[in-house]
Amino acid sequence: MEQLHTFEIKDQFYLDGNPFRIISGGMHYFRVLPEYWEDRLLKLKALGCNTVETVVPWNLHEPKKGEFDFTGEKLHGLTDLVGYVKLAQKLGLWVILRPSPYICAEWEFGGFPAWLLADGDMALRTSDERYLRHVRDYYKVLMPYLAPLQITQGGPVLMMQVENEYGTFGNDKKYIQVLRDMMREGGIDVPLFQSDGPADDIFQNTAVEDLFPTANFGSRGKIAFDCLKKYNHGGPCMCA
């Protein structure tokens, strides 16, 4: 069993009780053939990163309703999420996971399975119970794979994201709260965070208790962080 570490978010990030700066780079496991994972992760580490981030595309892992694949036995091993995270840990990297249901990521349908469209006028990314029923079915399978990978259980996963850039899409906070609760009920006990564009109306659309806010931007960092500071309750500023 791996040594147990602790990770906390207070006025800054703390790893094993010591201040810790997350330097993260994104590398999505399903976009790189598994035989190249180690090489690419080592290159990420050589850049100075101590953490790798990846989204989890729902449509990759449940291409048909009720048919799940996390084994890596299909698609040339690209579905082996657990193997990827464990490899990152072996190479000395921490991990941040963004486990759907919507990922954006310039990925087909934002990661949603196409079969969702067969369910009439169901409203995606809302608290529509028809939609949430499908998310719940997916999470009941997904979360048991993710829970053992958390830092609290000897794994490398520091944090997990809820939804993605939701404040630019809607303001259904009940939806975000339900996703948060589903993850907690699925055994996720690491900090949960949100990632949104740095604007007041966007943060106000999506702010939910117990979710750490981060900003998503590519330039004008000071302006972005000044806005984020209004909503992160004195916590660390993070571009995620």
Question: PLM features: residue spans?
Answer:
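N-terminal carbohydrate-binding accessory modules
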Residues: M1-E53, K86
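Aromatic-lined substrate-binding rim segments of carbohydrate-active enzymes
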Residues: W37-E108, L179-E185, D189-V190, A207-E209
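Short active-site-proximal "capping" loops at secondary-structure junctions
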Residues: F30, P57-H61, A199
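Non-membrane alpha-helical structural segments and their capping/turn regions in soluble enzymes
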Residues: P34, E38, L75-V82, E129-R136, ...
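Short, flexible loop segments at the rims of nucleotide/cofactor-binding pockets, characterized by
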Residues: Y29-R31, E73, T214-G218
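Substrate-binding/catalytic cleft of secreted carbohydrate-active enzymes
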Residues: E2-Q3, L97, P101-H134, L142-A240
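Residues that line or immediately flank small-molecule/substrate-binding pockets and catalytic motifs
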Residues: M27, V56-N59, N164, F217
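Short amphipathic alpha-helical/adjacent loop interface patches that line ligand
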Residues: Y139
